[in-house]
Amino acid sequence: MAITEEQVKHVAKLSKLSFSEEELADFTNQLDKIIDMVELLEEVDTTGVPFTSNVNESINVMREDVATPGMDRKELMRNVPESENGYIKVPAIMDNGEAGA
């Protein structure tokens, strides 16, 4: 099953991506090779091979929750570009109706 440039354009549009004609051709070629490899894997006879959903034998390995000292607050605050009332001040990324965002 080959993939077409139209299919790649469609997926790119859904992903809000845009490609040049050269990039489109490159991605189409790469995706076509990937599909060929998957089709090749589908032909492998796995009869008698046990199903494994997790190859790692460890199950629910937990560690004790231990509090450890963090970085010294004064040392940390020396490295921040801007602070206010003991907190690190960062630029607003959402506008909630207040000035500055």
From Swiss-Prot:
InterPro entries registered for this protein in UniProt: Asp/Glu-ADT_sf_sub_c, GatC
Molecular function GO terms recorded: asparaginyl-tRNA synthase (glutamine-hydrolyzing) activity; ATP binding; glutaminyl-tRNA synthase (glutamine-hydrolyzing) activity
A Pfam entry, by short name: GatC
Highest rank taxon of the organism: Bacteria
UniProt keyword annotations, A-Z: ATP-binding, Ligase, Nucleotide-binding, Protein biosynthesis
GO BP term (any one): glutaminyl-tRNAGln biosynthesis via transamidation
Subunit structure: Heterotrimer of A, B and C subunits.
Family: Belongs to the GatC family.
Name this protein carries in UniProt: Aspartyl/glutamyl-tRNA(Asn/Gln) amidotransferase subunit C
Organism: Enterococcus faecalis (strain ATCC 700802 / V583)
Gene: gatC
